[in-house]
Amino acid sequence: MFPIKSGLEPKRKQELLEFQKQAGLKFKDLRLLDLAFHHRSFSNEHNNFHANNERLEFLGDSVLGLVAASYLYKSFEDRPEGELAKIKASAVSEDALSKTASKLNISNYLVLGRGEEMSGGREKKAILADALEAVIGAYYIDSGFKAAQKFVLRLLESTIHSVLEKKFISDYKSLLQELVQKKFKTVPKYELKKASGPDHDRTFWFSVSINGKVYGPLSGKTKKEAEQSVAKVAYENLCSESTVSK
């Protein structure tokens, strides 16, 4: 099950115990938690391509989504599906998750490759958000759904209320898609225009095409970030056009 060495160094074990105490977790097997902090840049540099948190992140993303959707469904009976989807998208967005990861000091426990470390990987939103999802996935495997659900709800409740109070920027890709479908009966088409930089410090440029009009390209340190940036510009432009035409 574990693609990394089975034993934990005393210093690393102490670090993991410190994290789970302040995060309110209790792992039966700390190796799972350790794996959740291993970024692919480290495994790639050490020629062990499976010793990273990507599979745990995949699982944690699904657990997070289910818990968030279930909580919203039960807690906001008067809200329509579209509004619940917007709240969920914002609450589990990379921006929101990275903020939560920062509160948990996840950056202190990450295991990164040398190049990623030198490029400031510990502070990158995508890496922090992915690591948090990996921790959720690891806790689900270790302690079951109910324990993972309890942990996620503890993280999510304040975030969801912040979303409702408009403290978080919405998921512009979701907002744009809904607006475009309603206005033009089609969907936005994103296109990667350019990618540059080494693997550990890439920059991506995306444009979005809507009903024959192209917005962008705009850049981001991840594909998601670049898509969100250009979606925000397109959404705000379309909203302005709608206001002017009224």
From Swiss-Prot:
Function: Digests double-stranded RNA. Involved in the processing of primary rRNA transcript to yield the immediate precursors to the large and small rRNAs (23S and 16S). Processes some mRNAs, and tRNAs when they are encoded in the rRNA operon. Processes pre-crRNA and tracrRNA of type II CRISPR loci if present in the organism.
A single BP term in Gene Ontology: mRNA processing
Originating organism: Treponema denticola (strain ATCC 35405 / DSM 14222 / CIP 103919 / JCM 8153 / KCTC 15104)
Enzyme class label: hydrolase
Domain RNase III intervals: 16-144
Active site residues per record: D61, E133
Domain DRBM span(s) in chain numbering: 171-240
Catalysed conversion reaction: Endonucleolytic cleavage to 5'-phosphomonoester
Stored HAMAP family: RNase_III
Family indicated by similarity: Belongs to the ribonuclease III family.
One of the Pfam families matching this protein, by short name: dsrm
GO MF: double-stranded RNA binding; metal ion binding; ribonuclease III activity; rRNA binding
Keywords of this entry: Cytoplasm, Endonuclease, Hydrolase, Magnesium, Metal-binding, mRNA processing, Nuclease, RNA-binding, rRNA processing, rRNA-binding, tRNA processing
Subunit field text: Homodimer.
Stored NCBIfam families: RNaseIII
Binding site for Mg(2+): E57, D130, E133
EC identifiers of the protein: 3.1.26.3
Protein name stated in the entry: Ribonuclease 3
Presence of the UniProt keyword Ion transport in the record: no
Cellular compartments per GO CC: cytoplasm
Lineage, opening ranks: Bacteria, Pseudomonadati, Spirochaetota, Spirochaetia, Spirochaetales
Location relative to the cell: Cytoplasm
Cofactor(s) required for function per UniProt: Mg(2+)
First and last residue of the signal peptide: none
